[in-house]
Design a protein with these regions (language model features):
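Catalytic machinery of carbohydrate-active enzymes
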Residues: 1-131
Length: 131
């Protein structure tokens, strides 16, 4: 998934987006999708404890299956997992929730590499979340 796939989120009003991305992939923040303003906090994330402190103060984490998604779930924070079509066994097919993290909601691809419909569903859910 690339930052450009998140373009539908730009239409959701009342949200502030914070990037928890570090390393070379964070360079995508230099050219975000039109209208999507993302705060880059990588310079303040020295270690995973810093990431945990930030996650603990966010209203919602939207992430692919990474350590950040698991961290948010373990901290009991609401997390929306953008899950690939052939997801790992731990996400259990046919479920939108997770037995591992009560605050996790899954948005799964309908086909391999298909993020468009996922992000449309996420944008709709985010509209409801902020209202």
């Amino acid at each position: 998934m690339r930052l450009t796939d998140m373009a539908p989120l730009a239409a959701v009003r009342g949200c502030s987006f914070v990037s928890l991305q570090v390393g070379p992939p964070a360079a995508q923040l230099n050219e975000p999708p039109a209208g999507l303003v993302v705060l880059d906090v990588a310079q303040w994330l020295g270690d995973f404890a810093d990431t945990a402190a930030l996650v603990a103060n966010l209203d919602l984490v939207i992430a692919v299956d990474t350590a950040v998604a698991h961290l948010a779930g373990a901290l009991g924070r609401p997390v929306w997992l953008l899950n690939r079509f052939d997801s790992c066994w731990r996400w259990l097919l046919g479920r939108d929730d997770s037995p591992w993290y009560p605050g996790l909601r899954q948005f799964r691809q309908s086909g391999q590499g298909e993020w468009g419909s996922v992000m449309q569903r996420v944008a709709g859910a985010l509209e409801e979340f902020v209202c």
